[in-house]
Amino acid sequence: FKVLEGEMKKGFYYIIALLIVSLFWSCSTKKNTKASRFYHAFNSRYNIYFNGKTSFDEALLSMQNGYKESYSDMILMYPISAQPKDKPETGGPFDRAIEKSNKAIKLHSIKAKPPKKPGWRNDPKQRAWQEQEEYNPFLKKCWLMMGQAQFYNADFLQASATFSYIARHYAHDEEVVAEARLWQARCYSEMEWFYEAEDILGKLNTNGIPRKNLNQYAAVYADYLVKNKQYEEAVPYFKTAIKAEKNRRQRTRMKYLLGQIYAEQDQNGLAY
């Protein structure tokens, strides 16, 4: 009986090991199934991304708290604009968020094509599905966090390259493309590459901005116009951006700057 019991235990462990291997294989990034997409989206979101986003938020709050405002001139719309344009080396307080983004992409990216359905070439949705470059539905968040972390590290050139890649990588998702292009325009504005920033903003406006991105567009364009001292043109975009801004501190900053713009235009009745 002891021999039989030992054999049964071995068989049980073998079955468990087989199930674990089967589960791992079914959720491998080399397989593109509903199960593998769910598994890798879940793990990238609630494990790696969560830790990176927590670090990102803490670094951003610390940056905001540490910024000393100067009221002798027109204030900056965003404190990041006070950073030097010619930073000698990359890196900074947002490195951990970048590290976590890279880790999530490395471990959980699914680039394998899904099984093709009969007649897929004649179905626009199925054709677009097959043409995607990334099938983990959550990784777009990781890519965007990476670019934003580089941006807040004041590595604007590096961040602009990341956002440019995101726009190409997620060409099938117009909202992600618009968000990435708007961040890219912010990078160009911070580097004072105003022609490049204007080109992106103009093309977005011409091609049509997804409804979800309209408020972001207003904020980015308002900042661009103020940097170019086009104060009158900036006012309507400021009003839209202020209404949409959820962060109380940033909303107060934008209201104060709008008041300064009114004062600059001798509209003191609107300034206060």
Language model segments and positions:
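Bacterial N-terminal signal peptides that target proteins for export
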Residues: 5-15
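Disordered, low-complexity tails and leader-like regions
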Residues: 1-7, 52, 194
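Acidic, polar-rich low-complexity tracts and alpha-helical solenoid repeat scaffolds
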Residues: 27-272
